Amino acid sequence: AYELWFKQILTEVESITDIFAKDSVPEQQIAVAVGRLHRINRIFELLIQQFGILETMTSLDFMDFRDFLHPASGFQSAQFRVLETTLGLLDSNRVNPTYVKNLDPADAEKLTNAASKPSLFTLVEQWLEKMPFQETENYSFWKDYKKVIQATFEKDRNDLRHNSYIPEPERNQSIERIDKMEEGFNALFDPNLYSQITDRRMSQRATLATIFISLYREYPLLQLPFQFLNTLVEMDENFTMWRYRHSIMTSRMIGARIGTGGSSGSDYLAKTSIKQRVFVDIKNVSGMLIPRNVIPPLPQEIVGKLSFVFEM
């Protein structure tokens, strides 16, 4: 059942990559992509629920037929690996980058073909990099955004300095944390500093576009892009939840034993749920947003472009 559903998920993901592989992505096609992501997320919810049925078995019940599964394992599922690669999972982010050795030549070739094509992550990143509206000849949103960020951090520091209820050592530690956070924000506006951040995969331009979409999501032309990014993150989270529930079930059934495919069992699965995420940079943009009451107002020129031509 899982293989059939993963085949459907792969079909949906490939159709979304076809949409974003075009030089220009029409708004109605973004709506199509959102609908397909919703379908993927409903499938994941079903897959996660099915673990509850499997867990009605006891460990001894599972042991009665476990040996008949050997050496078959989800660890060896070529389709699952193709799905991960199509989404954009890098070999460097895999818990076991030698997984190809467990595949037969025909399946290894399928994986090679998938890896030779632009992943969904790459295509979404390129789409975000083309996002307009952030700057015009007379206006730069990022200058206003940077001023708000700097003022926010300075206010936080001043509040701490004047808070006599917090012991001085703790105040100093909190101020140091704010300083480090500010350094991270400053890297958003400096390509050289941004390139030195090793835990971010998404490009600077794509990250800035994601922030802009998230802050001004209520404007008509940004509503669908925001929904798309939101459902993309939801899919990544569902994938992570599926891995986690898989690891919990495996731990319950076999404890610390080796998995049927030769992996380290529940320990391996638990590690994949933490490390093997694809769209975590989009999710982390939430930590770069600012309160609505301090979001810089956009000039009328940009507001007009982001709004419908005719509004009731």
Residue ranges and their predicted role:
Residues 2-312:
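Surface-exposed peri-terminal alpha-helical interaction modules
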